[in-house]
């Protein structure tokens, strides 16, 4: 049975292209694998607070020296890390806000990127501690030209950041499904959604088969 962790970051529910395509991804996965376990963490309906000074102190305090106050400050981080550890597949859905990710997603990231929990450092090299997982990232941008050799590609700080971050944690198998020009005319929007939806259906069909035991 596959465990899929879905993270939604769009401030919008109605009219959100990233949420819509993530819905399609999940429904497609369940159509192929009805017994899959889907865990949803909506960072807008249930916002993750930004880390505090105590949270950071707790991250770098040896377990034997953790005070009750520090354990409380890192309890949410423990919970979020447990969720991603249990997951076989990670599905991130996020819009591009001002060329980068929403602050809600960054807050979640700051809770799950944690030394000796999701990455290690031996004094010379970093190593990710979450290997063997797949990640799919659905992104939405109002304008076009952010992907490939597009004129706005240098301004795309969503894909390269998330690609590096997930790899840093040991998740090397990352697939992006971007939809662009979501503020264009209706025909262009429909074409863009159809193309992204078709890609998702193809990805899901192949991914579910790969997840199943031989």
From Swiss-Prot:
Top-level taxon: Bacteria
Top enzyme class: oxidoreductase
Reaction(s) catalysed (UniProt annotation): 2 a quinone + NADH + H(+) = 2 a 1,4-benzosemiquinone + NAD(+); N,N-dimethyl-1,4-phenylenediamine + anthranilate + 2 NAD(+) = 2-(4-dimethylaminophenyl)diazenylbenzoate + 2 NADH + 2 H(+)
A Pfam family reported for this protein in Swiss-Prot or TrEMBL: Flavodoxin_2
Binding site for FMN: 10, 16-18, 96-99
Disulfide partners: none
UniProt keyword Protease present: no
NAD among keywords: yes
UniProt keyword list: Flavoprotein, FMN, NAD, Oxidoreductase
UniProt cofactor note: Binds 1 FMN per subunit.
CC cofactor: FMN
Gene Ontology MF terms: electron transfer activity; FMN binding; oxidoreductase activity, acting on NAD(P)H as acceptor; oxidoreductase activity, acting on NAD(P)H, quinone or similar compound as acceptor
InterPro entries xrefs: Flavodoxin_fold (IPR003680), Flavoprotein-like_sf (IPR029039), FMN-dep_NADH:Q_OxRdtase_AzoR1 (IPR050104), NADH:quinone_OxRdtase_FMN_depd (IPR023048)
The EC number(s) this enzyme carries: 1.6.5.-, 1.7.1.17
Family statement: Belongs to the azoreductase type 1 family.
Subunit structure, interactors included: Homodimer.
Function: Quinone reductase that provides resistance to thiol-specific stress caused by electrophilic quinones. Also exhibits azoreductase activity. Catalyzes the reductive cleavage of the azo bond in aromatic azo compounds to the corresponding amines.
HAMAP family, per the entry: Azoreductase_type1 (MF_01216)
Protein name per UniProt: FMN-dependent NADH:quinone oxidoreductase
Source organism (scientific name): Bradyrhizobium sp. (strain ORS 278)
Source taxonomy: Bacteria, Pseudomonadati, Pseudomonadota, Alphaproteobacteria, Hyphomicrobiales
């Amino acid at each position: 049975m596959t465990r899929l962790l879905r993270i939604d970051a769009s401030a919008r529910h109605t009219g959100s292209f990233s949420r819509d395509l993530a819905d399609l991804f999940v429904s497609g996965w369940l159509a192929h694998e009805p017994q899959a376990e889907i865990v949803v963490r909506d960072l807008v309906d249930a916002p993750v607070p930004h880390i505090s000074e105590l949270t950071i102190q707790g991250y770098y305090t040896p377990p034997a020296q953790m005070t009750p106050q520090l354990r409380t400050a890192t309890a949410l981080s423990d919970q979020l890390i447990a969720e991603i550890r249990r997951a076989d597949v990670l599905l991130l859905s996020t819009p591009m806000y001002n060329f980068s990710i929403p602050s809600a997603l960054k807050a979640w990231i700051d809770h799950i990127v944690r030394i000796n929990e999701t990455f290690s450092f031996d004094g010379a090299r970093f190593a990710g501690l979450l290997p063997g997982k797949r990640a799919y990232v659905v992104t939405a941008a109002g304008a076009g030209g952010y992907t490939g050799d597009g004129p706005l590609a240098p301004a795309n700080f969503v894909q390269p950041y998330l690609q590096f971050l997930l790899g840093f944690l040991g998740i090397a198998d990352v697939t992006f499904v971007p939809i662009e020009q979501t503020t264009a005319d209706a025909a262009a929007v429909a074409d863009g959604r159809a193309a992204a939806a078709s890609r998702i259906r193809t990805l899901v069909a192949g991914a579910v088969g790969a997840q199943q035991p031989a």
